[in-house]
Amino acid sequence: MSTPAYKRILLKLSGEALMGDDSYGINRATISRIVEEIKEVVDLGVEVAVVIGGGNIFRGVAPAAEGMDRATADYMGMLATVMNALALQDAMRHIGLVSRVQSALNIEQVAEPYIRGKAIRYLEEGRVVIFGAGTGNPFFTTDTAAALRGMEINAEIVLKATKVDGVYTDDPKRNPEAMRYKTLTFDEAIVKNLKVMDATALTLCRDQKLPISVFSIFRQGALKRVVLGEDEGTRVLP
């Protein structure tokens, strides 16, 4: 068995990653494939925590949110992430992967409240911890939640799973000559305004020297390759 490059990781999954080819919602085949890839990493002995977004669900109600108070819309988005967290947990249960959902909003009937010490203990016991409801505060993205939770649980790296296999010099869909960065420094990413994470999350990770890896969750085996330290995606380093 190959030796992982990291002992504990924070995986940031966008809600859109769960849609597959659908326009919104949760695609069952897609979520099943994603949790199988997470299981491969857990089987390597890696401790895995997940922060999940809510765009796949919130997209369906976004037209109704136009003109809505920003804080109210953000709370709706947080609730969408809890729905995704429960869907992830259910998919994990089907393949024998033990997980716990912790929510930054108090919803005790469906999820534990976020408690840092408990989350770390679950990770040490080999359970996957799924963080829902972002930071629990409006005006902060789930990227920022990923950076924050990554620091709190002492993760060695934040893995941002996207639709693109890394960070490019330009949009690869529009410019076929766009080049993928293998590595970047935080300062380079900020100065060049590269779409790694939002500015708050990027600055948090830079200040705490927490590396980020950006990769495509749609490339079979990409998550495992990143964890093994192979040339996959883009790494953003202090």
UniProtKB/Swiss-Prot annotation:
Q: Where in the cell is it found?
A: Cytoplasm
Principal subcellular localisation of the protein: cytoplasm
Q: Where does ATP bind?
A: 12-15, 55, 59, 162, 168, 171
Q: In which pathway does it act?
A: Pyrimidine metabolism; CTP biosynthesis via de novo pathway; UDP from UMP (UMPK route): step 1/1
The residues listed in the UniProt record as binding UMP, with positions renumbered to this chain, are: 54, 74, 135-142
Q: Which keywords annotate this record? A: ATP-binding, Cytoplasm, Kinase, Nucleotide-binding, Pyrimidine biosynthesis, Transferase
Q: Name one GO biological process term.
A: UDP biosynthetic process
Q: How is its activity regulated?
A: Inhibited by UTP.
Q: What HAMAP family is this protein classified in?
A: PyrH_B
What family is reported? Belongs to the UMP kinase family.
The task this protein performs is described as: Catalyzes the reversible phosphorylation of UMP to UDP.
- Mind telling me what this protein is named? Uridylate kinase
Q: Which organism is it from?
A: Methylobacillus flagellatus (strain ATCC 51484 / DSM 6875 / VKM B-1610 / KT)
